[in-house]
Amino acid sequence: MKRPEPVQVVKQRRDAVLNALVDNIPYVKFMGISFDRRGDELTALMPYRDDLIGNPFLPALHGGATAGLLEVTAIIGLAWSNLWEDMEKGTFSPEKIEAGDLPRVPKTVDFTIDYLRSGLPRDAYARAFVTRSGRRYASVRAEAWQDNRARPFAQAHGHFLMPRND
């Protein structure tokens, strides 16, 4: 019987896979978005920057920055949920990442955003919820909040084309 790996080793491996997935998308770095992993849940953080303000008179976050946060969160959340399942089943080896074999991310088919209120000039958080994930197609819902998770300032729903496993 094989002994289970130490928890710290498993955490480091999962973090390495997540970092490789995120680093594979230049827009994430450009926007300054980072991801916090707690078990299988991911929370995106977009730190406040002055250049993210769209309306300086309110001031309010630019709608494009909000949309970018939500779409990136949905894509990374969907890719991570699939990678998580594969890692748990043992069908994905983190050594692939070390060898430079990065996972392909889903492609956006459509993405609809509901702006519920103005985003304030402060850090924004987002989380994605996969509502359906098949071999070819997936649906994801995402929401963004700032001070109180129960009061999102924007939410989105998107459909994605899943990468083929060639």
Where are these regions (language model features)?
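HotDog/MaoC-like acyl-thioester-processing domains
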Residues: 2-12, 76-79, 115-166
